[in-house]
Structure formats: C-alpha cells, structure tokens
Design a protein with these regions (language model features):
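PLP-dependent amino-acid enzyme catalytic core
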Residues: 1-198
Length: 198
C-alpha cells in the first residue's frame, strides 16, 4: 500500500468521467475575519459536474462505471421526495439512456424539496410513493438490501457502497492536492455537509 495516496492511485478503477476536478475553492476572507479565523475556504462541490453538482455525482461516477452496472438500463432506488440522490440518479439515467424507478417517502416541503421533486419527475423516471420510509422498507425490503426489484437493479440508498465511496476518497485526495499546490493553507479543521448521511 502506498505511503501517500494520490488521485492517480484510483485511476486504474473505471469511472464515467463526470467529475470536473478539481472543484474550485472559495476563500471567505470576510467571514473568516468575523469569526477570528486565519482563513475559511469552501470547496465548491456544487460545481462537481454539468450533469448535477454534489457528492452523489462523485459516487455515481464510480458506481455506474463498475462491471456489475455495465449494460443495466433499468434502475431502482430510494429517497425522500426532495432527495439529492434521486436527482443525481435521474440526471444519470437521462445521460446514460436508462430508466429510474424512484421509490420516495415523505419529508417536509421546502422550496428545495419542490425543485428536486420536479427534477426527478421530469426525468426518465417512474415515481412510487410511500407515506414514510418504514412502510416503504416493509413493503419493498430489496430497496435497502439490494438486488433486483421489478426488473430494475437497485442502486444503494445514497449510492453508498464500497465502490461509490471511492468518489469521496478521490474528493479528499483532490483537496490534499490543492493544499499541496498552495491553493489553500493546510486546514486545522474540515467540516462536511451532512444531509441524510447517505
């Protein structure tokens, strides 16, 4: 195992090439000053890809390129009605000419939830609604255990899988490269946005 990993170590693993890296860094000098910090920098992963931004695209970049997904044109996955994961999957389905069975459960309505739901509904998708995640899992346990449901291969919730996680590992290595290149000082602390945890 290499002493110091770089993104090059992951280049032997198939990817779709959707991530435009490195994502830019935004220096927030005024906010850093207000908080008495030496620096404050935001990594703009919302600009990960023209397809759709965010870490889900990083995960799908590896997951959907893996051998078990080659030729799969019908997918199923789960998320709340405003799920960023289902947005990324709907965009991926359109890009790869696939179809997504989106199994959704309730969450409180916000503008972002409405926008995400509209995006998923406008894609190559069939939406199946459940009142809550418990009833969904009881009625369709394969949505969380994996396999095939209704002829569709199940994408793990949040695209969280060993191969999908490589997208996040690559993001961390990308940030390390940016620090090494002097694009930002070595951070004392890293804060990561946490939605559903998927």
């Amino acid at each position: 195992m290499p002493e110091h990993w770089t993104r090059n170590h992951l280049d032997v693993i198939a990817r779709l090439g959707w991530v435009e890296e490195p994502t830019p860094l935004l220096s927030c000098d005024e906010e850093a000053s207000r908080r008495a910090l030496a620096s404050l920098t935001i990594k703009r992963d919302d600009l990960t890809s023209p397809l759709v931004g965010g870490t889900k695209t990083r995960k799908l970049d590896f997951l959907l390129a893996s051998p078990e997904w080659q030729g799969q044109k019908k997918w199923a996955s789960v998320g709340a009605i405003g799920s960023g994961h289902l947005v990324a999957l709907a965009a991926a389905a359109k890009e790869l000419e696939a179809h997504l069975d989106a199994h959704m459960f309730w969450e409180p309505i916000s503008q972002g939830v409405k926008e995400n739901l509209a995006f998923v509904a406008g894609g190559p998708t069939t939406i199946r609604y459940y009142g809550n995640r418990i009833s969904m899992v009881l009625r369709r346990p394969r949505l969380v255990s994996g396999g095939i449901i209704g002829g569709a291969k199940v994408v793990p919730p949040g695209a969280s899988s060993p191969i999908g996680t490589l997208g996040l590992v690559r993001a961390g290595l990308e940030l390390a490269d940016q620090v090494a290149a002097g694009e930002l000082p070595s951070p004392d602390h890293l804060y990561v946005a946490y939605g559903s945890g998927g």
